[in-house]
Each structure stands twice: as C-alpha cells, then as structure tokens.
C-alpha cells in the first residue's frame, strides 16, 4: 500500500524506475547482441558505428573540390576552378556534395541500407553527410529525398533516401518533405546501365506535389540520395522541380562514384 501511495504522490519516482528498467533491459540486449561494426561485423564499443579499421578505409571527400560538382581535386588551383564535368555538361542543380568516395566499405553500407532491411544504418551515414554538406545548410533549405516508386518501396519496406533525409533533418534541424516529389513511373534499377541508358530510364519518371510552391515557400531544396553515380536521377528530379517553379536545387549524397578513383557501380 505504501508503495502504491508513493507512486501516486511522486510520479517522478515512477519515471526514474521505468528509466532504470529500460537501462537494465538495454544492458541485457547488449550482452545478448553486442554491437558490431556496420561493415565487417567485428565487435565495437557502441552500436551503429564502424570499427577503427573500416572507418579508416572510408575515403572522405574534402577540399579542394569542384564548387559545383563536388569532385575532389588532387591540388588546389583556386576556389573558382571548375571540374571538366561541370564545364562540359553543366548540371541543372547548383551544387553537389558527397561524404565519401564509393569504395568497398561504402558499397557495403549502401547495400545493407538499401537492400538489407537495415534502416538504422542511415543514422551513421547521415552523420558523415551532415559534415560534408555543411555549406548547403545555410539559408534554411528543405531536405527532399529522391523518391522510390510505391511498388518498389513496398518491396523494400522503406525508402533508403527517405531514411537518410529524416536522419539528416534531425542532425541539422532542417525540415524534411518526403512527399514533395513522387516517382510516377516504375523504372529499371540504374545499376549496370550506361550514362545515356540511365538518362532514358528516368526520363519523365517524376512529378512534384500540386502544392509544391506553397510547401517550399521559395526556399532552396536539397535533394538527398544514397549514391551519386552519373547524376541522371538527381538531374531528372532537379529539372522536374525547376520546371514546377522551384527557385534553386542542390544535391547531397552519402557516396560519390568517381571514375578511376575506386569502384564502378
């Protein structure tokens, strides 16, 4: 009886007990399922991280880089120097940034996030994206994930780009609008297609929400994706947004394929 009265008179005590029980349960889970590296499954001290060896194997993309495409340069030749790609084929978006080069470790993370039913991996990837895209967060833009076709999203259970955008929104404090762009045509997967084939594959595949202008309210849009390969998908989405009246679009991704640097996709 005394214990029951204590619960009623001191609800804070109840919450502390519940918190302690949750903590004990967490420790039991850690003992039964100890945290492991997101890439190689080696034991780690905390969950949702890479071990020291795998983390060192990641290739972060840092300055000097192309101010438009975000491609890394070996040496700095000035802040306004553009890459050959940006000069030969100027993109419809303003800037693209990526956290890491697409290599073995990055491929495993993306594959597990995308096809392995591991949405929690988005939290780790988003932490790296938040740093790599820091200059894109100025001016309070809206984060918009590259959409999946509804049928494909049902197959995978979630949109990996949507998970990245939500995790990134929590880290940066930026708004996320997952419904601003829709994929209206189910396309082939881009893996294995040529650059031209990728462009044809996504042509006419996207549409914006009818209230896009109201929802964006003149704010810049930052598209969020897992891997930037040729840019066919992000360029198609960007053109769709600009045609509908968006003022400006930037792009951010976890990994970036750089020809000759690491792995093809």
Where are these regions (language model features)?
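Glycine-rich phosphate/pyrophosphate-handling loop used in enzymes and phosphotransfer proteins
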Residues: 1-265
